Amino acid sequence: MPQMAGLPWLGNLLPMGADPLDFLMRTARRFPDLVYVRILGSGYIQVNDPHLIEEVLVTRSGSFIKDKDLKVYARAVFGNGLLSSDGEFWLRQRRLAQPAFHRERIAGYADLIREHTAQAMASWRVGEVRDVHVDMMETTLKIVAHALFGAQKDESIVEIGECLDTIMARFDFRGLTVLLEQALGRVIDRAKHERYEAAVRRLDAIVDGVIDRSRKDVHQADHLLAMLIAARDEDGSAMSDAQLRDESKTMFIAGHETTALSLSWTFWLLALNRDAHLRLREELRRVLDGRAPEMADLPKLTYTDQVIRESMRLMPPAWSIQREALMDVDIGGYQIPKGTNVLLSQYAVHRDPRFFRDPESFRPERWTPEFTRQLPKYAYFPFGGGPRLCIGQQFAQMEAVLMLAMIVQRFDMELVAGQRIVPQPSITMRPKYGLRMRLRAAE
């Protein structure tokens, strides 16, 4: 197996810590199959070939579990939720949660998405400068709070958002803190860690309160938490309060981060690519003529869907997946020893020139049915894959298309000059300094 050269003991800590995304990209170009990368006396295997990625996520998925180091961090926040659990427990939780994400159930949330998007836009004014990232995070948080818990007071939603921001900041992979803490097994930034622990405790208390209230009216309620409370496994068992809390927190993060970031990066890319913006607006004018989109419109909004796909190719909210070999395993003729960490980077693979012509360019029109058919399946995997494919994928895709269609019909977004746009690889890939845009009336 090829190995990346590095410094004694430090290995590749410095370039990985300084700019993880750039390091992953350069590594993928140099080693198109896979490569062993050393960091602080340990290391991981970066897998870059789509067919090998498919072996890890699908063909040999039973030979891998969630990466141990990441799981320790994730479990401190999400407990034993779908994001951080493994094995039979994960399978049981997935079975219990799956009915809440059936296609018919998801379609029922279209009105909720339109309602909250319209409410957000009602407060926007032509000519003002807004942080679009903040707006998208707030709007999708309200949507997922309503879908998960039913109608909630705005103050509670704001407090949940503040807790999540503090928690997500703890997982920033830009800089060396997280890598060093993993290697040394102890906390370095004590003040940041204390803020994080306080946010976790407060989030737990808020969610516990909602669960307690929801149990009292579970038969009258029509939201995801009520479905989870009522769900029964094959043996008749239900989720405990702790399990409900863990899954609720997991769905909060997964349910609003992916769409909010997808839309934030989409508005940035559209602001930089005027031709794509004009083509998008023309499709919306032709199909919708100024009205809010319905579920029946989605098959007709082909370019709108292509815009979202291309945005998630270049700027995937989930920028990497990490696994650990549960046993000695052969992947494409390469021997991976038990206990070895494996990293799959959507950010790097989605920009591979072997599969994407002009990979650094924003070209939504590339996503024709013909192109999609010939593309190796795991050359593009923004929602992961295999048994652990994101349970909310259909919800996120529907939400992104509906919101984008509504907003672009009302507003043009012009990027404010002079700001730094820096992707921040945390659990998700956020814009570190936000995305300030000036609102213009759609022509």
Short names for language-model regions:
Residues 1-4, 24, 65-71, 89, ...:
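Cytochrome P450 heme-thiolate monooxygenase catalytic core
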Residues 1-92, 107, 111-119, 139, ...:
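N-terminal membrane-proximal hinge/A-helix region immediately C-terminal to the signal-anchor transmembrane segment
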Residues 12-32, 205, 209, 291-332:
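Conserved cytochrome P450 K-helix E-x-x-R motif and the immediately C-terminal K′/meander segment
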Residues 28, 117, 134, 165-166, ...:
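Cytochrome P450 proximal C-terminal region
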Residues 103, 215-219, 295-302, 390-392:
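Conserved, non-catalytic sequence blocks in retroelement Pol enzymes and Pol-derived host proteins
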Residues 258-283, 394-409:
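Cytochrome P450 catalytic-core helices
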Residues 344-371:
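Conserved cytochrome P450 K-helix/beta-meander segment immediately N-terminal to the heme-binding cysteine loop
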